[in-house]
C-alpha cells in the first residue's frame, strides 16, 4: 500500500500547483459571473429586493466583479504585492458572503440548505485565500 501511495504522490507532485490554480479560477470566475449578472448599473434587482440605494447596489456589483478579477490576476504576481492582493480578495469575498448569508439566506442557518449551497463554498474559498494568500 505504501508503494502505491508513493507512486500516486510522485505523479501528483508534478502538477501540485494546478490544484490551487483551479480553485483560484473557480472562485474568481464565480465572482466575475455574479458581478456581471448585476449589470447594467445600478442593478435594479438588488435595489428592489434589498431596498439598497443605487450607489450601494452598484458598489456590490463592481466589488464582486473586481474581486474575481483581482483574485485571478494576483495569483500570477509572485511577490508580496500579489500575496496582499490575494488576501484582500479573500477578505472581500468573506465579507460579501457573510453579509449575503445573513441578509439573503438567514433562514438557512444551520440547515442542510446552507451546506448544499454555492454560497457556503464561496465563503470557504474566501476564507482559504484570506488565510493562505499566494502560499497555496
Describe the function of each predicted region.
Residues 3, 40-54:
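Membrane-interface interhelical connector segments
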Amino acid at each position: 500500500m505504501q508503494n502505491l501511495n508513493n507512486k500516486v504522490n510522485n505523479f501528483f507532485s508534478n502538477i501540485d500547483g494546478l490544484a490551487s490554480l483551479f480553485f483560484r479560477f473557480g472562485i474568481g470566475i464565480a465572482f466575475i459571473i455574479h458581478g456581471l449578472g448585476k449589470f447594467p448599473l445600478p442593478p435594479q434587482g438588488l435595489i428592489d429586493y434589498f431596498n439598497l440605494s443605487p450607489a450601494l447596489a452598484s458598489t456590490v456589483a463592481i466589488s464582486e466583479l473586481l474581486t474575481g478579477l483581482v483574485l485571478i490576476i494576483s495569483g500570477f504576481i509572485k511577490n508580496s504585492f500579489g500575496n496582499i492582493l490575494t488576501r484582500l480578495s479573500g477578505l472581500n469575498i468573506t465579507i460579501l458572503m457573510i453579509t449575503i448569508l445573513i441578509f439573503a439566506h438567514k433562514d438557512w442557518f444551520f440547515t442542510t440548505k446552507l451546506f448544499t449551497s454555492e454560497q457556503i463554498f464561496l465563503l470557504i474559498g474566501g476564507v482559504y485565500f484570506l488565510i493562505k494568500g499566494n502560499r497555496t
